[in-house]
């Protein structure tokens, strides 16, 4: 299974600092983190590309809250979507990671283009 689940999925709550979100991104190695609420519902996403833009704008990683710099219109998919369809979404949107949710918008996993490549699915 190419979908990362459980502790392998980078996720933080909206009230953490950018610094804490970066630790989560680094620890999980996906180049992004999901932002979730207390019920694990997806609120947004923050990527390494966003980090470059945020730092370029002069943000302080110790005081900036992730809620102030996250993207709320992130692309998601469902666990029953075929890998080929997930790859189409990634390529069409020029993104490298895709959050996976259930029908209620709860985070259940993440897909990464490099994982799909490693599994020979592209």
Q: Which sequence ranges carry the predicted segments?
A:
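Bateman (tandem CBS) regulatory domains
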Residues: 1-9, 63-74
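Short hydrophobic beta-strand segments in globular cytosolic domains
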Residues: 9, 42-43, 101, 107-108
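The conserved cystathionine-beta-synthase
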Residues: 12-29, 36, 55, 76-95, ...
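Conserved active-site beta-strand-loop modules that form the wall/rim of enzyme catalytic pockets
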Residues: 30-33, 43-44
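Short hydrophobic beta-strand motif reused across regulatory alpha/beta modules
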Residues: 44-49, 96, 108-116
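A short, polar/charged loop-to-alpha-helix boundary motif
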Residues: 50-64, 116-122
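Short alpha-helical segments enriched in small residues
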Residues: 53, 60-72, 79-83
